[in-house]
Curated annotation (Swiss-Prot):
Disulfide bonds join 41-93, 136-186, 232-282, 323-379, 420-473. One of its GO terms (molecular function) is axon guidance receptor activity. This is Neural cell adhesion molecule 1-B. It is a single-pass type I membrane protein. Residues 860-871, 968-978, 1080-1092 have a biased composition (Polar residues). The chain crosses the membrane at residues 706-723. It comes from Xenopus laevis. The gene is ncam1-b. Polysialylated by ST8SIA2 and ST8SIA4. Polysialylation modulates cell interactions by confering both attractive and repulsive properties that are highly regulated by ST8SIA2 and ST8SIA4. Polysialylation is formed on a-2,3-linked sialic acid of core glycans. This protein is a cell adhesion molecule involved in neuron-neuron adhesion, neurite fasciculation, outgrowth of neurites, etc. Heparin binds at residues 149-153, 158-162.
Amino acid sequence: MLHIKDLIWTLYFIGAAVALEVNIVPDQGEISLGESKFFLCQVSGEATDISWYSPTGEKLLNQQQISVVKNDEYTSTLTIYNVSSQDAGIYKCVASSETEGESEGTVNLKIYQKLTFKYAPTPQEFTEGEDAVIICDVSSSIPSIITWRHKGKDVIFKKDVRFVVLANNYLQIRGIKKTDEGNYRCEGRILARGEINYKDIQVIVNVPPLIQARQIRVNATANMDESVVLSCDADGFPDPEISWLKKGEPIEDGEEKISFNEDKSEMTIYRVEKEDEAEYSCIANNQAGEAEAIVLLKVYAKPKMTYVENKTTVELDEITLTCEASGDPIPSITWRTAHRNISSEEKTLDGHIVVKDHIRMSALTLKDIQYTDAGEYFCVASNPIGVDMQAMYFEVQYAPKIRGPVVVYTWEGNPVNITCDVLAHPSAAVSWFRDGQLLPSSNFSNIKIYNGPTFSSLEVNPDSENDFGNYNCSAVNSIGHESSEFILVQADTPSSPAIRKVEPYSSTVMIVFDEPDATGGVPILKYKAEWRVVGQEKWHARYYDAKEVSAESIITVTGLKPETSYMVKLSAVNGKGLGDSTPSQDFTTQPVKGEPSAPKLVGHLSEDGNSIKVDIIKQDDGGSPIRHYLVNYRALNAVDWKPEMRVPSNSHHVTLKTLEWNVDYEVIVVAENQQGKSKQARLSFRTTAKPTATTATSASTGLGTGAIVGILIVTFVLLLVVVDVTCFFLNKCGLLMCIAVNFCGKAGPGAKGKDIEEGKAAFSKDESKEPIVEVRTEEERTPNHDGSNQIEPNETTPLTEPEHPADSTATVEDMLPSVTTVTTNSDTITETFATAQNSPTSETTTLTSSTAPPPSTAPDSNTVQSVQATPSKAEVPTASSPPPTSSPKVAPLVDLSDTPTNNPSKAVANQAGALNPSAATSAAEPPTAIIKPVTTVPANTTSPPPTPEPKQVKQEQSGTKSPEKESAQPSTVKSPTEATKDESASLSNTKPLQGEDFQIDGGTFKTPEIDLAKDVFAALGTATPAAVASGKASELVSSTADTTVPPDSAKTEKTQVEENSKPEETDVKSTPAEVKTVPNEATQRNVNESKA
């Protein structure tokens, strides 16, 4: 217990003794310049004051840089901001107490400099090849150790002598390369403090530019709208910039003629001209330096005339023509005229022309100039690039020069021109004189003067000897004058030619002669050859053109008889007349030798160059006429001959076309007659070279051949369509009508009149080319009239049907029952009468109608004489009897108003076949038949134009026969069955005529192509068909026995036939024809007996 008390008291006394103890935390301090640091002062015991004192002993107060803060009664804090070297030293913390006194504590503040890089810029750039020094300045309070590292390694260990660390710790790289480029680390170390710091420095190695021209020399041609590209290739680091200079002057981007690519390595010059020729520099520049390359642009130029001059001088003077030209290479200059070239070294012997050449210039000197030197001179400059030519005009003024024939021939009464051709510049005034008297004058009324630009003609019409003689032509201009005498001489007929040789053949003679010695002053126009048979007085003559025979001086007389003696003589003909004849020479033609002589060939190449006209001149025919010529030809380089051609003997030439260009050809012609062939006549020629195609200089709107042919075809097709449509609507015929009937079910053209028409006529052809008349009376009944369906006729409907045995009655009833068949002085025309309106005919009846004019012996125009018919042919009056001059005044049954009206036919009188007048009063009114005249062509007429109908009926062509001969011929009769079996009438012949209108009681309807024969008109008293065929109108003739027929009787027949076709007017010659079959023998026999 005692011990515890002692311990407590001991501790108490110890604590009282150390109550003002001062402790500074941290007890020491080191700080780098610029850094901040604080110290904490702790006091043990109760202190009334705690203060801080600087190393200099000054009490520190609370300041901006040094802060003193008393935290509580026991602690105080000293803070030093941004220390500097002056702040180093011992700082003291003092604690004081009133009872205890003072107590202090100290701390030593050490200040040092931290390792820093004072100057180490990055990047650092160097030029390749130089000694580079990499700068790195290090700052520290105590020395530091500096090392350099590159790519993670110390450069010292590279063992590269180029790397050296200098004394100032800089790194030197000798001859730095582009491969040395990169990051270098500068590292500092302080061993005492273990401090380390580093700095990475980027090293850039710049490479100087290198530049090279792709082409050192570039060639171009000026004025050819060319473009040229100049280019350079540059290299370096960094990439160099390129610029261009021309003759040391910068070329700016944006000039009109120049453009650059993106990096300016290429420069394009447009529309190169000679002025663009120069040295161009391309310069590459970067931080390492610059480089330059030279490009030479050589511009060649076509020659161009720079100077020419037109000149004028006087005859006999001297002048020099100068021509200058530019171009590269230097052009050579030559001279030429329109007719020849003048060389640069040319110098005539007399010194008339001298040519001297200089660089880019040439001079042409003309001495003693003549008027013929005037004209156009061409200066031609040429070099390898091209040629330029320019004309200059050289004008020579000279005195008049008179040209023309001095002697002129004519004769009295023949006007002649004396022409004075005047050459002068300037133009001259021309005057005419006769015996010193100016013409024209009142004393010379037969003289006229005609003036032209370069001539003056004096027309003299001599009427006496005084008009012949001298005439003077005088011409004057500003340079001088000249006159000339012209002599007008009276011409004479030529002298006789001289026969040198006479070479006879079988039918020709060849006369070789010499031209007359004297032409009489005027040209020989013709030669006259005269010949006669020896012993006869009559001379035969023929004229030959002097131009044709003068070339070879040979005349060939043709048309002679073989083995005959002849006399021949020649004479010449000029403008005045026929000259003297040569003495007659005898010769004898040779016997017939058979084959002809080879013809003579003359070729005329055509303008197109690849065709030729070969004239074939007939020679001796060998005594028999030449039948034809055999023509063969081929190209000489070809083996085969072209197909042989036969040319008629009356042809005088043959044309060979579409030959090859620029090829040699040979032609062989052989004449052939009945006796054989002649020898070969040969002709060789060469075609011209194929012309080059030229392009039209102006726009042409002409059409090609194909377009023209196409237009013509389309026009023709459209025309056919228009005609076909017109025929369809007007005449109910044509292709459209055929399609409508056969495919569309349209009624045929005869459907309109089937209920109105009471008789139809169809016109067909048989082998005898005679028309067949079918007549159906309204009393007849056919299978189509029994109320059943009627069959419309069409193009395929047969014309005839097999004859029904039960039908034995005559199918034709005349208006006068006593007569059914009438025979007249006419041709026989066979027509078929349909027994049903719209069905094929079942029987045929042959009637005879007149195609000849009626005889002139008719007693009256309205009288019909009754003639008894006999079984034999009726007596035929003369066919040449003229028609009567008067016409009956009766109403016409047939309207032929569309036919030609000239020479209208009169009423038929004195008909050979007449109606029986006694039957007219007793017979009932006959059924009305619808009749249409057939448009026929007489056998003896000229070729008529084709009719509009598609089916043309052919008329039998027969020669003119006398009535006497025709009456002696027996009648030809065919049975009805034979007529039925006759198949010569083809389907085309049985087609109905369309478009023909009938008027019945004012109604109009169409009928097929069916016509009644002319003899039906004769039977009914109308005009003969011959009158219709010749364009003459027909009129109805009364069928009664009275000599006069009242008009009312004719008017009872209301049927009027309108004929649409207009037969061409022709001269008809009657040809008696044969009578053909009648339907049954009983009717035929009765008719014949009545005629008898």
